[in-house]
Amino acid sequence: MVRRAPGASLALLLWVTAVSCSPAGPGAATARRQDEAFSTARLTSRCLSLQITRISAFFKHFQDNGSLAWCQNYKQCSKCLEPCKESWDLKRNHCQSFCEPLFPKKNYECLTSCEFLKYILSVKQGDCPAPEKASGFAAACFESCEADSECSGVKKCCSNGCGHTCQVPKNLYKGVPLKPRKELKFIELQSGDLEVKWSSKFNISIEPVIYVVQRRWNQGIHPSEDDATNWQTVAQTTDERVQLSDIRASRWYQFRVAAVNVHGTRGFTAPSKHFRSSKDPSAPPAPSNIRIANISANNDGTVNVMITWDLPEEPDIPVHHYKVFWSWTYSKYVIPAKKKRRKITDGPQNYVVLEGLQPNSNYNVELQAVTRWGQIRLKSAKVSLHFSTTQDNRNNNEQTSVEKPPKGVVDPYPTFQRRKPTRFLKIGTPFYQDNQLQVKIYWKKSGINMNQFQVHSLLESCTHNDTKGLEKVTELTYENYMILKDLSFSCKYKVTVLPAKSKSRFKAESIFFVTPPCSTFKEKTHKHINCAAEEVPVLPKVLAKPENLSASFIVQEGNITGHFSWKISKAVLHQPMTGFQVTWAEVTTESRQNSLPNSIISQSQILPADHYVLTVPNLRPSMLYRLEVQVLTTGGEGPATIKLFRTPDLPPFLPHRPHLKHHPHRYKPPPEKY
């Protein structure tokens, strides 16, 4: 779990979710997870880059973790981030199927972002070399690959003029940020959290840089890379530090960091030195959900009872063994300890069979977990279970803890016979209605007996001074949703939903959200909304617009390079100009069923204010391209100037040599990413 770093006003870390679920071996699965972490970071960088002028209006430096928080709560930017939030097999499903249920009306940002993510998941960094440059095995005339994923390492599936082979790309790291410095600094805070810090080398990237942080660990007296877990992504952040709260004593941790932007990455730093917490490990948690799994009768009239429980998820030290005590009881008065019987089970085992119990009798069972830390034994609190071997009462078993009051009726079925409930707590897009800011929160019901819910909303903080004293509101509902009303602008809220019946075994679920600034609604709805409480002023409108868009093309060695230029009139510049945002896309001729325009994913680049020319290599021949240029100023972006250009045909190529393997379609190298 990641907590807010001290001193950061708006800290947010984006957790990575899996985007593909194709089966593979352990090594391939690890490589796939790494590629997906990089891909989602590239997508995040792209989304922040597209909103860079709006971000700069709120933050002095867009390379700030607050920009991620802003992006998640700004409507257009949050739509752009949506594909990397959800677990979705983008390789097998259409982006339209993903985005339209989330945004039925305006889903352009989600769709283009989804298409971009699909593209970078399938196409590796770098450009294919010219076909005539292939040599050795790479020049063999047969189809040895169809996609980049079939090639090892950084190699790409490229044409050699008579086939496709895996080749080392050119321009592998063009526009890609440098690796962070390999020295990582660890600070163990009094709270037990661990702060990991790093520093970056000179950054050649104008786009926002996302840092992907991974860790692995081993358990034992000494650090060991051979016994360590696989690398796992713990966070993505634009800051040069991360604060982790789930650090366990007795574990040896290693970390590594990669710098990623929209163009790609140079990979991770070397593994850090090992870190182990200085605090002593905690005793194991008390066993949970102890219950009867089975009762069976023996030929001699005695009864065997199987007791089962849930294993702890992640104790500081793995459980070495469990102690099980049981005795006959009368009216829940326990027999003296010297008459108790005892068994010991191994730590990985979550059941025990009590043999030879008397029928029609009451029994009490106590269970305790034990771990070993050197020569010290750490013991959990005991939990107890009262049950009867009477046939009619076998489902009426009560579980209690020695240190806690009874918890009610125990589920008589083992874990593998029950389906654990899952609920999804989600926040809709805030809206302004009836002169007040509102938001809809909804969830999935998990049981037929869960008819009424308590909804607690807590105002935690605001960017302006009007915090209203951290107010808390509690409401009841019979529905699986609730609309929270009379919210404040630019404020952070915590919402907790739980069943109204206190005896339910389902735990409460919480979610945080930040309301947008007042100016967002005032600009869109033109309603009379009082925004005096907000400190962020409404930016003046930018009128500057690029003029005389023109294009020239150079054909060399089978590649088409486009040079796009424009002019700007200084007379209409009322704010200092910071640069240009240039977006281009390949336009198709087929019609589409969704709301996307007839183009593939758009690609963008931010240019400095003194650059009036953009060079784009690897354009496709005889293809229509859409060019869009906007002026960026300190007051925001100006209107876009749009023009269509068609690339020239390629000259006749070398005679086609025979294939050893035929495919109905040819692989076409995609345009270079910017």
UniProtKB/Swiss-Prot annotation:
User: Domain named Fibronectin type-III: which ranges?
Assistant: 180-281, 286-392, 418-515, 545-652
Which organism encodes this protein?
Coturnix japonica (Japanese quail)
Report the GO terms under cellular component. cell surface; extracellular region
Residue ranges of the region described as Disordered: 388-413, 655-674
Coiled coil, from the record: none
- Signal sequence segment: 1-21
| GO terms, biological process | cell adhesion; neuron differentiation
Chain segments annotated as transmembrane: none
Major place of residence = other
What's the protein here called?
Anosmin-1
Q: Among its keywords, does the record have Disulfide bond?
A: yes
